[in-house]
């Protein structure tokens, strides 16, 4: 690999799997999360358990044993301009939380490439589906 990328992921739950995959490729990743979660991740790393084809049960991948580096921080402790890619991996209500809302403003102003991994379509999309109560 010729270049290592520095990725910021907002959300340590949904963002964990992507973070692990980036670490496997040797990239650096910072997860944005609550203070208690950030302390735990910074002290003990992140573990993801998932099925693997051809294996019984789940495999566990420990971030501390991968070639990339993983850190975690609270929303007020990151500067989006320091990253090559920003990933939105939180559920919609979390983006209204104090600190996260301000971080999103900074993300927009940074003009850093941004992608979203969502667990469901956004409400404006869902409201267009006839017969679906979104209120």
Predicted regions, residues:
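Short, surface-exposed, polar/charged, turn-prone segments marking secondary-structure boundaries
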Residues: 25, 36-38, 57-61, 101-103, ...
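Conserved N-terminal Rossmann-fold NAD(P) cofactor-binding segment
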Residues: 34-83
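A sequence-composition feature that detects small, non-aromatic residues
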Residues: 12, 19, 25, 38, ...
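Generic alpha-helix signal with a bias toward terminal, lower-confidence helices
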Residues: 26, 43-44, 53, 60, ...
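Generic serine detector
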Residues: 2, 13-16, 28, 63, ...
């Amino acid at each position: 690999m010729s270049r290592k990328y520095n990725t910021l992921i907002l959300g340590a739950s949904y963002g964990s799997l992507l973070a692990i995959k980036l670490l496997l490729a040797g990239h650096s990743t910072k997860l944005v999360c609550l203070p208690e979660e950030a302390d735990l991740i910074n002290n003990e790393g992140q573990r993801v358990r998932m099925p693997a084809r051809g294996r019984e049960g789940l495999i566990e991948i420990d971030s501390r044993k991968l070639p990339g580096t993983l850190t975690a921080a609270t929303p007020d402790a990151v500067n989006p301009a320091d990253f090559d890619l920003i990933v939105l991996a939180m559920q919609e209500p979390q983006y209204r939380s104090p600190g996260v809302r301000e971080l999103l403003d900074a993300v927009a102003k940074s003009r850093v490439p941004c992608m979203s991994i969502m667990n469901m379509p956004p409400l404006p999309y869902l409201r267009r589906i006839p017969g679906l109560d979104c209120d």
